[in-house]
Amino acid sequence: MIKDPFARLGLDREVLTVSQLNGRARVLLEDVFSSIWVEGEISNLSRPASGHVYFTLKDSGAQVRCALFRQSAARVRQALKDGLQVKVRGKVSLFEGRGDYQLILDTVEPAGDGALRLAFDALKAKLSDEGLFSADRKVALPLHPQRIGIISSPTGAVIRDIISVFRRRAPRVELTLIPTAVQGREAINQIVRALKLADARGFDALILARGGGSLEDLWCFNEEAVARAIDACVTPIVSAVGHETDVSISDFVADVRAPTPSAAAELLAPDSSDLHRRVDNLHRRLVSRMQDRLMRERLRLEGISRRLRHPGERLRQQSQRLDDLDMRLRRAFEQSMHKKQVRLAHMESRLTAQHPGRTLAFLRQRLDALAERLPRAIREQIKVRKLQLQSQMQTLNVVSPLATLGRGYSILLDERGHAIRNAAQTQPGQRLTARLGEGELQVRVEDNHLTPVTLSLLD
């Protein structure tokens, strides 16, 4: 047990000098905080010529000075910089001359999003050097796709938003969901398999979509395996991962990046009303150009007529030519008008066929079919979850600490209930508790061997 260096203060009115106070404080801090882990953000980083590294570790409410001496700094693999979130290990010490305490560090590791951001930047640079982000690899999206594959979670707002956009803008487009997990380690292989399956089914385009989340939540879309699977697809892919401010490796590799899943759907959903307006505009432009052509020919004929010197046979020939041109122009105009009218009628019939009432009836039939399948799917899922739970319970029983104790091992606890991991944590004569598979023993430390002791396995 650590002896309190201030135990006598207040009893016999011992008066300390400032140096004595700081010296005792340093001993106390180094004994109590001899090896601790602390997490925070680096700021005020400096690297003097000595090779040591000094910085301030802070969070939203406090800060502490840190020193990483040259030998320890050489073991740090990550490039340290201001703003990096890190986990550090070291001891608390006090600089007696100023009375300031600081952390003397031996280990620095990136923490949280800091580590993920380093991995993101490294993979981005690697794939960029390989040319996976090059514009030459991008495939243009089809103007009027008829079959679209959606790679996303089957539940949640994302798939509902995409379906809503297509129902409003292009209800006749066939949508197929290739379900996959979109978060966690298992999502990586599922997304890769879904991309390969969708690419082989001959869709006009694919949407890879997921809602917003933290960098860790979206991390499966920053995996190299997913990026290479996207690059290997022949089918054009729109990446719609997260919110507008979220950027993933998938966005760089895909043919087009959409800020949201709804925006991805709008990129691929042709607007029926817009098509109707375009047909009307083309019709007006055609009529205007035909009228301009007819006017130019008439003016040309009038000019020729004025240049005629003898009205005889030449006049009759020009008159016949004019009649012929007039007939040809009228016939061409009528044919063109007929074609446009037929096309317009066809477009009107298509618009009629896409009436919301028909779509609603189709969706009601689909809803009824899904309602019949839902109870059976729920029962199957419950059965699978029960089997998984039983398997996990068996695994927990195998790795349980109590099972380890049951095989003859024990755990030594000090008087505060802390586990003893090495002999340096004990003192001769110290009372310890040995927890066994069944019951406990009170033991006393006779001696502590601070050097490793080799145990013979043959005795």
Curated annotation (Swiss-Prot):
GO annotation, cellular component aspect: cytoplasm; exodeoxyribonuclease VII complex
Spans through the membrane: none
Acetylation is among the record's keywords: no
Record's keyword terms, sorted: Cytoplasm, Exonuclease, Hydrolase, Nuclease
Cell location: Cytoplasm
Enzymatic class: hydrolase
GO function terms (MF aspect): exodeoxyribonuclease VII activity; nucleic acid binding
Keyword Hydrolase: yes
Known catalytic reactions: Exonucleolytic cleavage in either 5'- to 3'- or 3'- to 5'-direction to yield nucleoside 5'-phosphates
One of the GO BP terms on file: DNA catabolic process
Entry EC no(s): 3.1.11.6
Subunit structure: Heterooligomer composed of large and small subunits.
PANTHER family named in the record: EXODEOXYRIBONUCLEASE 7 LARGE SUBUNIT
Function according to Swiss-Prot or TrEMBL: Bidirectionally degrades single-stranded DNA into large acid-insoluble oligonucleotides, which are then degraded further into small acid-soluble oligonucleotides.
Protein family (similarity comment): Belongs to the XseA family.
Name the record gives this protein: Exodeoxyribonuclease 7 large subunit
Species the sequence originates in: Pseudomonas syringae pv. tomato (strain ATCC BAA-871 / DC3000)
